[in-house]
From Swiss-Prot:
The keyword Ribosomal protein does not apply. This is PF03932 family protein CutC. The gene is cutC. PANTHER family: COPPER HOMEOSTASIS PROTEIN CUTC (PTHR12598), COPPER HOMEOSTASIS PROTEIN CUTC HOMOLOG (PTHR12598:SF0). Its main location: cytoplasm. It is found in: Cytoplasm. The lineage of its organism: Bacteria, Pseudomonadati, Pseudomonadota, Gammaproteobacteria, Enterobacterales. It comes from Klebsiella pneumoniae (strain 342). Gene3D superfamilies: Copper homeostasis (CutC) domain. Belongs to the CutC family. Disulfide bonds: none annotated.
Length: 247
């Protein structure tokens, strides 16, 4: 049966994903940035409370995946922290300035991760040669690749996803970006064995007092009075589709 990984941005998200049938959780912060390294406090609390496998993302900032020496040093420190806290895996990725997998840095990441299962995230979708990148990551020992097939969604990138699945069993190809119940059958039909979905929704803040016109974001139009949450019904619906597909 295909694995359903749900991207979670808080303890509440993780609890809802677990309750509604997720098989694994990718733990992140900052949904507006596409996922950044969670805080130590969130890591500890989720590690203690959630029984599902949880793979934290290690990503120091938004934007591209070509990092300074200082940023990369911080990533290695975070990887060691994730390992020491006892997580079974992590999600990360680095590219060089030419859009290739940064092999020297990935070797350091793999050494720091040790026995942890490493997922190479959607930096893969920004690399110059995805076929060579798939081969390189396999040689490095990366467990899986999260990809939309180098398109804006996994549905649009189904051609490359199918090609990479046919190329071999390792690294595992996990389809992600825009995955939902409506297009999940298409991915399963293509032979995808792991899918990644945020199954997310924005909910209104519990704040009754509102101070309009003041934002904590660089975007003056950002809405401070909403929060990101996992939609449990969406998770359960996708899990139901996967379970029925098996039968």
């Amino acid at each position: 049966m295909a694995v359903l990984e749900v991207c979670c941005y808080s303890m509440a998200c993780a609890r809802e994903a677990e309750r509604c049938g997720a098989d694994r959780i990718e733990l992140c912060a900052a949904p507006q940035e596409g996922g950044l390294t969670p805080s130590y406090g969130v890591l500890v609390s989720v590690r203690e409370a959630i029984t599902l496998p949880v793979h934290p993302i290690v990503r120091p900032r938004g934007g591209d995946f070509c990092y300074t020496e200082q940023e990369f040093a911080a990533m290695l420190s975070d990887i060691r922290m994730v390992r020491e806290l006892g997580f079974p895996g992590l999600v990360t990725g680095v590219l060089n300035a030419d859009g290739q997998v940064d092999i020297p840095r990935m070797k350091k990441i793999m050494a720091a991760a040790g026995p942890l299962a490493v997922t190479f995230h959607r930096a893969f979708d920004l690399c110059a040669d995805p076929r060579q990148a798939w081969k390189t990551l396999g040689e490095l020992g990366v467990k899986r690749i999260l990809t939309s097939g180098q398109q804006s969604s996994a549905e649009k990138g189904i051609s490359l996803i199918t090609e990479l699945i046919a190329a071999g069993d390792t690294p595992i190809i996990m389809a992600g970006a825009g995955v939902r119940a409506a297009n999940l059958p298409l991915l399963l039909q293509a032979g995808v064995k792991e899918v990644h979905s945020s199954a997310g929704q924005w909910l209104p803040s519990d704040m009754r007092f509102r101070h309009p016109g003041v934002s904590m974001s660089a975007d003056p139009d950002a809405d401070e009075y909403r929060r990101y949450a996992v939609n449990g019904e969406a998770v359960a619906e996708m899990k139901g589709i996967i379970s029925a597909w098996r039968s």
